[in-house]
Design a protein with these regions (language model features):
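Short, low-complexity disordered leader/linker segments with a strong preference
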Residues: 1-29, 54-55, 59, 82, ...
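Extracytoplasmic "Venus flytrap"
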Residues: 29-53, 61-79, 94-97, 172-182, ...
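Short, solvent-exposed amphipathic alpha-helices that sit
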Residues: 41-56, 145-149, 179-199, 241
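Hydrophobic alpha-helical segments within soluble ligand-binding/sensing domains
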Residues: 74, 136-167, 215-216, 263-268, ...
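Flexible loop/hinge segments that line or gate small-molecule binding clefts
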Residues: 102-144, 264-278
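Hinge/cleft segment of the Venus flytrap/periplasmic-binding protein
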Residues: 171-172, 288-336
Length: 336
């Protein structure tokens, strides 16, 4: 009996020790909450984010709603991250307003928030004054990316020996938001600068349109009537309207040289055509989604390590018929 009592006492003591031992801390985590998840763009962002986490010993989770209208769903994702004791930082791009409470909670819990891609909806309208948890933005520098298009397109025009005073370049700007303005201005400023260095004065006409069906086709037609010799398109939406017109009216547009922005199936088909059946798409700039994901997580980690942080602008990647498949394999260029 005494032996049994002794055994029971030992078991009770062991149980007490186990109960008093604090739960083992889980893996330190950075939660990435995007505007989507399944699209190739977001998958490339995810790959970059996970890689940055692995390099620094952090687990990276990645979530996004199935559509950009599911604000409540995305709010739940943010709330779940905030309630997870292992989450040390959040990387966030919101699809609408309604995140006031979540951002305030992040501030109060001292969880830094990195904005990425388009950042917080409506330029951070949900941030409460004095309770801002955001530490920086990682996104495409649209002006820099527009300038990258200009540098490469100008080099092509110069190599083809087609540049003369008064050479006509049209620009189809996709809307009047900062994105459209910066992509157009970056291109125009840089290509004028390069031309001036060669003592050439270009004639540039800007067609500024909204994202309404048919408007980009009208802009294309207007630039053709004006006598455009080259045309720059500021996003995938413009390309998706222009390409079918260029294919259907080969003779009307065959002599015009094109350059663009973003990715997508139409740009892939057009650029791979190489001018064989319709006007030539010389090249375009893709947003470097992999690097956006990578640098976003790196920024969060730097803050957690007590380092000074600042916004990171990503310039994009120029692609042509020659390197488009390589960028596709690296998840920089995406279809869809």
């Amino acid at each position: 009996m005494k032996k049994l009592i002794a055994i029971l006492l030992v078991l009770v003591m062991v149980a007490g020790l186990v109960a008093c031992t604090p739960a083992q801390e889980g893996e330190k985590t950075i939660a990435v909450i995007a505007k989507g998840e399944t699209h190739a763009f977001w998958q490339a962002v995810k790959a970059g984010a996970v890689k940055a986490g692995e390099e620094a010993g952090y687990k990276v989770t990645f979530q996004g709603p199935t559509s950009e209208s599911e604000v409540p769903n995305q709010r739940n994702m943010v709330q779940t991250a905030l309630n997870n004791p292992n989450v040390k930082a959040i990387v966030l791009a919101t699809i609408g307003t309604g995140f006031v409470d979540e951002l305030t909670t992040a501030f109060e819990k001292k969880i830094p928030v990195v904005e990425f891609d388009s950042g917080l909806y409506a330029n951070g309208a949900d941030i409460t004054e004095g309770k801002d948890p955001t530490i920086g933005l990682v996104a495409t520098d649209n002006k820099k990316a527009g300038a990258l298009v200009a540098e490469n397109f100008y080099a092509y025009l110069k190599a083809q020996n087609v540049l003369t005073n008064g050479y006509k370049i049209g620009v189809i700007q996709h809307d009047s938001t900062a994105t459209g303005i910066d992509r157009a201005e970056g291109f125009v400023e840089k290509i004028n600068e390069l031309a001036a260095a060669d003592s050439i004065t270009l004639d540039i006409q800007l067609e500024k349109k909204q994202n309404n069906a048919g408007e980009y086709k009208l802009a294309l037609s207007s630039l053709k009537e004006w006598g455009a010799q080259a045309i720059y398109m500021t996003n995938e939406g413009v390309v998706n309207e222009v390409y079918p017109e260029v294919k259907d009216q080969v003779d009307a547009y065959k002599s015009i040289l094109f350059c663009g922005f973003d990715c997508g199936t139409n740009q892939y088909e057009w650029i791979k055509d190489g001018g064989a059946t319709c006007a030539l798409l010389v090249g375009s700039v893709a947003q470097d989604s992999y690097t956006i994901g990578y640098e976003s997580v790196k920024l969060a980690i730097a803050k957690l390590e007590g380092k000074e942080v600042k916004d990171v602008g990503i310039g994009g990647a120029w692609y042509t018929k020659e390197n488009i498949d390589d960028l596709k394999d690296k998840n920089v260029f995406y279809m869809g």
